[in-house]
Amino acid sequence: MHIIIDATTTQDQFAFAGVGQYTKNIILALLKNNATIQFSILRFKNKISTLDKDISKYKNAQLVDIGEYKINDYKNNIWYFTQVLPVIKKIRRKDSIFFSPYFWRNYPADIMPTILFVHDMNLALFNMYSQQSPIHNQIRKVQYWNAMNKSTKCKYILSNSQTTKNDYLKYYPQYPSEQVEVTYLGITVEERNISLDKYLPSDYKERQYLIYLGGGINRSKNSIGVIKAYKEFLNLRKQNGADLTKAPYLVIAGGQFQNTEKPEVQELIEYIKENNLQKHVIFTGFYEDKYAYSLLHNSFAYIHLALYEGFGISTGEALRAKVPTILHKSPVYEEIFSETSLLVDGLNEQETAKAIYDVYVNPEKYKNMIERGYTKSLDFTWDKCAEKTFKVFQKVA
């Protein structure tokens, strides 16, 4: 068996998002656990990859250049047919299988056995193919469906939850459901507490903080809902006579929130200014992976109000960090985290604020939930994910 894998999402704008993290971790786990199998890893030439630190230790990995770096955009198909497909045809063997961890850059399901990982149907459900402009949205919509429709030619579809599987089959009811395999993702956060002085105010230990980590700036992430709920939480404290100058911070972690050219980021900043929250809301900017555990573990609660998710890696990390989790009552969170988290209507800031307040003033009440969450998080490993993935490879071989 020979496995060809597209690893470009470890190098492009998705490298530190869920898509890129999945690609990195599933490749490393597959290499580690299948030493006798030859893997060809497709990568851009002269471009840093999140795989660079670890992949050199695996002798069963052949790194294959596919040309200079190209951003993931509307020109994907031109790049695929002129740069990538010729390389695939050159290196494929009779026993080759192609594994595509993401669909946007196209994949050779029409010429060889292919397995595609579907992370979610978010873009289709929210008609959110591009946030650049309505024209860009239409262009990307056409590209999206051209790429996604090709998935019906794949031998198998992998998905990160039963929710994603169900959503995929709603759009493609003709695809055999038994050939859509659910493989929950892994949680890799290192349980090590390190100083947060470079990211947080000096008084964060005294004032405490609510953390929003692993979010995004598209509409379905509902980042504005987090800030609105936090504002209502402050109002609850004020009603109960608390000094707001000593109120817990809202910490928003992630480099994407620094891109002030994005209308979605501008909306957040404007709301913060309009409601005089500048001294209460802290943006960490980009943070190294090694700080994720400490950012989570030292918070009094983690909040994620995304209206739709495929899985929720950062939520799993929060469970591992033993922090109460407050989540929007979305299908996937009900599927995976209903017994380990507080589920709320993320579009109702008053309801969400009451949940935040209760966790803040009654921490003892949530100790059992925290322990259940930690135990649950241990179920999610990349070794398990890779094992199920490789079994699908074997079915196709």
Region spans (language model):
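Carbohydrate transferase catalytic cores enriched for Leloir-type hexosyltransferases
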Residues: 1-397
